[in-house]
Design a protein with these regions (language model features):
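Phosphate-binding P-loop
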Residues: 1-3
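The conserved Walker
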Residues: 12
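Hydrophobic anchor at the beta1->P-loop junction of P-loop NTPases
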Residues: 8
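Internal catalytic-core helix/loop-beta-alpha segment
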Residues: 72-106, 110
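Conserved glycine(s) of the Walker
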Residues: 15
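N-terminal phosphate/diphosphate-binding loop that engages ATP/GTP or pyrophosphate donors
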Residues: 25-76
């Protein structure tokens, strides 16, 4: 039986990252070694000013993109490709030891990096459970790779977390 593949998608600010974080927390509570990448928002004075990038296993954090950074731009944000590549490599260095992989997110900013693109392709070929948050605009590329959960701001994160864990047979 192939390893479970879960794709989470939805509009910006719909709760995709909250769901990924909820799944990570629950999996860790069940004793699973979770590895991957998270990209939480940077909020200053109630405004989103950028995104961090975190290697889940080591908890090492860098700035992925910011309004006042340097690098290629996606919307108002400038993407730091060097930091993105660094965290992507850090994750890839210990992917084999993971029980479950979580990637948040596969989106426009992240796909500017060749190293990230290669990683995003590779994780769907290894025999480990994968949970990936995928930007809606990228869904055509990833639609056949796993069970898709489309969420919105009305979605019940707790119930969806339970359903995904059950579908992955990790609800015990």
């Amino acid at each position: 039986m192939p390893a479970p593949r879960i794709i989470i998608t939805g509009k910006p600010r719909s709760g995709k990252s909250t769901l990924a974080l909820s799944l990570m927390t629950e999996l860790r509570l069940k004793g699973k070694w979770v590895s991957g990448i998270l990209t939480p928002e940077i909020i200053k004075k109630k405004e989103r000013t950028g995104f961090r990038i975190i290697d889940i296993a080591s908890d090492e954090t860098k700035v992925l993109a910011s309004v006042d950074g340097k690098g290629p731009s996606v919307g108002k944000y400038h993407v730091d490709l060097q930091e993105l590549d660094y965290i992507t490599q850090k994750f890839m260095d210990h992917v084999e030891s993971a029980d479950v992989i979580i990637i948040d997110e596969i989106g426009k900013m992240e796909m500017l990096s060749e190293k990230f693109r290669n990683m995003a392709e590779k994780i769907f070929t290894i025999e480990k459970p994968v949970i990936a948050v995928v930007n809606m605009e990228m869904m055509k590329q990833y639609s056949g790779t796993g069970d898709v959960f489309t969420i919105d701001e009305k979605s019940n994160i707790e119930k969806i977390t339970e359903k995904i864990l059950k579908d992955m047979k990790m609800d015990d």
